[in-house]
């Protein structure tokens, strides 16, 4: 999958001049796609089917998160996590725009200058609530109508319902804030996760007999409430169960919020390796223990509960094949 960063007019012109899209055009799926949740997946699936039917590439039109979120707003996925998920759904190309570059375009300029001239869009696929153009003046119905006038096509994907109602990134964040991880997993299509490289910690867990994997939480990424979680760590295509503390490790008076994971039944060096950490269930809040011995006792209690949960969870229903 090709990824094109379009932050300036020069980037846009270079993309148009140097990118060899099919003469027959492309199917363009439009959206921010934060979380790439089940509603996004349904939209992209329809776009992919259309691209295969027409034998033309599937192009994702999206934005850099930093340029399109309000100040202080957190996102479910980093840009890199989003791109990984989009590739897994069959996208041939992702065009990532700086929102400031196009926010002042009229709705017709967006359609004609960006979608038609620059991307050579044959068919645009958008959600029912897609808005575009300066002041969000354009909607999905207008896009469909205007493309038809230009001998192109627009497809509108209706509202996707899941769980107790509509699926959205806002709904998923609310569930995660309440530690309703299973409910959020059904809406995301897989458990909430963090991708990143394992960093060197202080070695405190190792000294206690519970060596841990430490990962930072990107500042722009939505973070779960502090506490201890039953997790699954993916390393080199293999899955390992774990206990993860999200927080500051108050027993040892650390400061920055991060994740610290004790991997069950694992031996090996994972420092500096790229891993994915899935959050399965919340076990308890973060506690400051009066001694290392108390902490060790609690870790053993947490481990026992994690092993019980493994038997209770329907893993395939949340997109993981844990044996």
How would you label these PLM feature ranges?
Residues 49, 56-120:
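Active-site-proximal cofactor/substrate-binding loop regions of enzyme domains
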Residues 29-31, 61-62, 94-98, 123-128, ...:
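Short beta-strands and strand-loop turn motifs
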Residues 1-26:
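Positively charged, low-complexity intrinsically disordered leader regions
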Residues 17-73, 78:
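N-terminal catalytic cores of NTP/NDP-binding nucleotidyl/phosphoryl-transfer enzymes
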Residues 105-211, 290-294:
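Classical nucleotidyltransferase
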Residues 150, 201-323:
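Phosphate/ribose-recognition catalytic cores of enzymes acting on nucleotide-derived substrates
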Residues 37, 86, 124, 184, ...:
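Residue-level signal for inorganic ion chemistry
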Residues 33-35, 65-67, 100-102, 129-134, ...:
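Short histidine/acidic/glycine/proline-rich micro-motifs that form metal-
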